[in-house]
């Protein structure tokens, strides 16, 4: 299984689906499922049952939250010009491996 090139905190753009064109920050990455959770994208509605809390508090009702999106449906946004780009890797002179933009060559 290949490693996930998109990390938590990256800004990505949705390239297909109902939220196409939307830009958002990656909240969480799920490498074992090849999915990412993007802030404000792929919102779903959950109906939760009322649960009795220990102190008499009740929580329940309709909740909207983000659902994971497959990494093939998002592209990372190049920080230099704000356009979506593919990701490559480069090894610096000191031996560290860094992610770079394929379009502009800038480090991500």
UniProtKB/Swiss-Prot annotation:
Source organism: Frankia casuarinae (strain DSM 45818 / CECT 9043 / HFP020203 / CcI3)
Record-level GO cellular component terms: ribonucleoprotein complex; ribosome
Keywords: Ribonucleoprotein, Ribosomal protein, RNA-binding, rRNA-binding
Matching Gene3D superfamilies: 2.30.30.30
GO terms of biological process kind: translation
Recorded superkingdom: Bacteria
Gene label: rplX
UniProt KW Protein biosynthesis keyword: no
Pfam family, one: ribosomal_L24
Matching InterPro entries: KOW, Rib_uL2_dom2, Ribosomal_uL24, Ribosomal_uL24_CS, Ribosomal_uL24_KOW, Translation_prot_SH3-like_sf
Role summary: One of two assembly initiator proteins, it binds directly to the 5'-end of the 23S rRNA, where it nucleates assembly of the 50S subunit.
Family per record: Belongs to the universal ribosomal protein uL24 family.
PANTHER family registered for this protein in UniProt: MITOCHONDRIAL RIBOSOMAL PROTEIN L24
SUBUNIT field: Part of the 50S ribosomal subunit.
Official protein name in the record: Large ribosomal subunit protein uL24
Molecular functions (GO terms): rRNA binding; structural constituent of ribosome
NCBIfam families: rplX_bact
